[in-house]
Regions:
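A broadly conserved detector of short glycine/acidic/proline-rich loop/turn motifs that flank catalytic sites
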Residues: 69-73, 81-85, 107-109, 133
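Acidic/His-leaning functional-site neighborhoods
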Residues: 74-101
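A glycine-rich beta-turn/hairpin centered on an aromatic-Pro dipeptide
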Residues: 39-81
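A short, terminal or domain-edge coil/loop segment
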Residues: 40-56, 84-92, 113-124
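C-terminal interaction segments
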Residues: 94-147
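Acidic/histidine-rich alpha-helical segments that form the ligand environment
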Residues: 9-12, 61-65, 75, 87, ...
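Short, contiguous alpha-helical
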Residues: 1-54
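Short alpha-helical "patches" and their helix-cap loops
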Residues: 26-42, 64, 122-135
């Protein structure tokens, strides 16, 4: 839909960086995995996590899912469900209720899954689960969020 010029530019930064990583992956020449464009892109992808956790994975109401991203762009996201809606919550709020599931993966895997460059397969050694593994696998199966 319609957006601002700033929105357009934010998406272009993400788009250019993702395609750079596509080319690097094909050429087996990693690089620029942790700079400002990578950080910006991972931040943009994180906006879709509530939809993935709440809607696609159908996390139970009142639960929290923690996603730990390691590697060049390390981040931790807590997504909580309440009254049929999911949203990012800060670590203080998340600490009040233990996560029902924790998913740990590196930032390169996170990006490849978010962009639909790779698809989740149960048993993928790059992805670790603690807690409700079935929920974690549903979250990962819904990770393709690239616009």
């Amino acid at each position: 839909g319609p957006g601002t010029f700033a929105d357009f530019l934010h998406i272009r930064v993400m788009d250019a960086w993702v395609h750079e990583q596509d080319i690097r992956r094909v050429l087996h020449q990693s690089g620029n995995e942790g700079g400002p464009a990578a950080q910006h892109s991972i931040g943009r992808f994180s906006r879709s996590l509530p939809m993935v956790v709440g809607k696609r994975a159908a996390a139970p109401d009142g639960s929290t899912v923690r996603i730990d991203i390691t590697g060049p762009v390390a981040r931790t996201f807590h997504i909580a469900t309440n009254a049929g809606k999911a949203a990012h919550v800060d670590s203080d709020v998340a600490a009040a209720s233990s996560p029902i599931c924790t998913i740990t993966l590196d930032s390169n895997t996170y990006v490849a899954l978010c962009c639909g460059r790779q698809f989740f397969a149960s048993g993928d050694p790059r992805i670790n689960f603690a807690g409700d593994v079935a929920l974690g696998e549903r979250v990962m199966a819904g990770f393709n969020v690239m616009i």
